[in-house]
From Swiss-Prot:
Catalyzes the oxidation of either pyridoxine 5'-phosphate (PNP) or pyridoxamine 5'-phosphate (PMP) into pyridoxal 5'-phosphate (PLP). One of its GO terms (molecular function) is pyridoxamine phosphate oxidase activity. PROSITE patterns: PYRIDOX_OXIDASE. It comes from Xanthomonas campestris pv. campestris (strain ATCC 33913 / DSM 3586 / NCPPB 528 / LMG 568 / P 25). FMN binds at residues 44-49, 59-60, 66, 91, 126-127, 171, 181. One of its GO terms (biological process) is pyridoxine biosynthetic process. Binds 1 FMN per subunit. This is Pyridoxine/pyridoxamine 5'-phosphate oxidase. The lineage of its organism: Bacteria, Pseudomonadati, Pseudomonadota, Gammaproteobacteria, Lysobacterales. It catalyses: pyridoxamine 5'-phosphate + O2 + H2O = pyridoxal 5'-phosphate + H2O2 + NH4(+); pyridoxine 5'-phosphate + O2 = pyridoxal 5'-phosphate + H2O2. Belongs to the pyridoxamine 5'-phosphate oxidase family. Its EC number is 1.4.3.5. The gene is pdxH.
């Protein structure tokens, strides 16, 4: 891990901890932007579940729209917006390649989830057409009955993705739109640079 990458990661960790201790309702909420093979973009909000020097992890159905995008075009952009921080909010952008996390990591995280969240992962055919709410509730009841009295295992089609950063951008809001921006970026040889940008 290079010094500049370590610096960017430490900056994120400091801001993330600040957001977790602030008035933010859900500091871990992030927008994940993907694209399909045709280049059509898509974005949605998911929750960050872990981060370290290897990257930023979230979990989902692998056959969801984002899961399919990431398996066919393994690049993503993450966006955190913490409006309550500092003078006028902070925004962090992270861009990078994407990897599936190991089955062991996915199993460990799935086992830590509330039981009803585990059941929901089995009952939901994420991103597929649903005829009615009652149909979903019936699927939930069926899964509850199937696993009554025993642990709920992780579905084969559910797992984690790790975004491996190739760029970080930190935006510090200020009055009169006189913001401050810093960008950290890796080149093709994984050499990191840091520069200030006009707001």
């Amino acid at each position: 891990m290079t010094d500049l990458y370590a610096e960017a990661l430490a900056t994120f960790a400091t801001l993330y901890a600040e957001a977790q201790n602030s008035a933010e309702i859900e500091a871990s909420a992030m927008t994940v932007a993907t694209a399909n093979l045709d280049g059509r973009p898509s974005a949605r909000t998911v929750l960050l579940k872990a981060f370290d020097a290897r990257g930023f992890v979230f979990y989902t159905h692998l056959d969801s729209a984002k899961g399919r995008d990431l398996q066919t075009h393994p690049q993503a952009a993450l966006l955190f917006l913490w409006r309550s921080l500092r003078e006028a909010g902070i925004q962090v952008r992270i861009e990078g390649g994407v990897q599936l996390v190991s089955a062991d990591e996915s199993d460990a995280y799935f086992a830590s989830r509330p039981r009803m969240s585990q059941i929901g992962a089995w009952a939901s055919l994420q991103s597929q057409t649903l005829g009615s709410r009652e149909e979903f509730e019936a699927a939930i009841a069926k899964v509850e009955a199937t696993f009554d009295g025993r642990d709920v295992p992780r579905p084969d089609g559910w797992g984690g993705f790790r975004v491996v950063p190739q760029a970080f951008e930190f935006w510090y809001g200020a009055k009169f739109r006189l913001h401050e921006r810093w960008r950290y970026e890796a080149d093709a040889a994984s050499h990191w640079s840091k520069r200030m940008l006009y707001p």
